[in-house]
């Protein structure tokens, strides 16, 4: 669109005001486009469409007084890296993301790492959030994922952990840290489970 405005500027070059006006409009459109790109880079994960880690860090001080933090991690992610390569992993992550969205949870979802999604359950205790995490885990475990090269469907599982904000927690990162420790402890022994911290 900016190029079209620039072309109009050259077309009406006989008038001294028209080129300046069209070039200024083109510059404004380019700046707005760059602003949108910067915003999307900071706040959105392009692969999944979820909010990014940066968005979590920026938005965490605005969370309500009562909330629960859940972490979902793809089981055997290192083996998936080797088996499917980069493109296959991206496709699997997109399919898992769609399955999580289809589970119709009320959580705000952030992509926090390669294989990690953080879910914020606003105004919910960890028992109510646990039920939603279990619903998500079951939805992914029951799904069959088809990759273009694969002739057989791929079965994937996720593990999760949930923790509620305590009064002693200074910020959401402390709750997230406690949740991650519980997930690591659980994942050391078993896959396809949801635990409470």
Residue ranges, per PLM feature:
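Catalytic strand-loop-helix junctions within cyclic-nucleotide turnover domains
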Residues: 120-129, 150-152, 158-175
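Conserved long alpha-helical elements within nucleotide-processing catalytic cores of c-di-GMP signaling
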Residues: 43, 53-68, 78-101, 110-114, ...
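Catalytic core regions of nucleotide second-messenger enzymes
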Residues: 110-111, 140-159
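Signal-transducing coiled-coil linker helices
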Residues: 1-3, 7-46, 54-65
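Conserved metal-coordinating catalytic motifs of nucleotidyl cyclase and c-di-GMP turnover enzymes
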Residues: 48, 70-73, 114
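Catalytic-core segments of nucleotide cyclases and related cyclic-nucleotide turnover enzymes
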Residues: 130, 134, 163-196
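Conserved beta-strand cores of small sensory beta-sandwich domains that regulate signal transduction
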Residues: 68-72, 110, 161-163
């Amino acid at each position: 669109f900016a190029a079209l405005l620039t072309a109009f500027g050259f077309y009406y070059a006989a008038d001294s005001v028209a080129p300046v006006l069209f070039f200024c409009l083109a510059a404004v459109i380019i700046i707005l486009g760059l602003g949108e790109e910067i915003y999307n880079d900071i706040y959105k994960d392009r692969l999944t469409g979820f909010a990014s880690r940066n968005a979590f860090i920026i938005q965490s001080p605005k969370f309500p007084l009562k909330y629960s933090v859940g972490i979902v991690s793809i089981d055997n992610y290192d083996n998936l890296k080797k088996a499917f390569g980069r493109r296959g992993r991206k496709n699997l992550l997109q399919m898992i993301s769609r399955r999580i969205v289809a589970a119709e949870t009320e959580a705000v979802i952030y992509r926090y790492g390669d294989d990690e999604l953080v879910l914020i359950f606003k105004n919910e205790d960890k028992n109510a959030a646990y039920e939603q995490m279990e619903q998500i885990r079951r939805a992914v475990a029951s799904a069959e994922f088809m990759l273009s090269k694969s002739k057989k469907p791929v079965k994937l599982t996720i593990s999760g952990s949930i923790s509620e904000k305590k009064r002693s927690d200074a910020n959401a990162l402390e709750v997230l840290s406690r949740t991650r420790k519980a997930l690591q402890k659980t994942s050391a022994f078993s896959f396809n489970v949801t635990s409470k911290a």
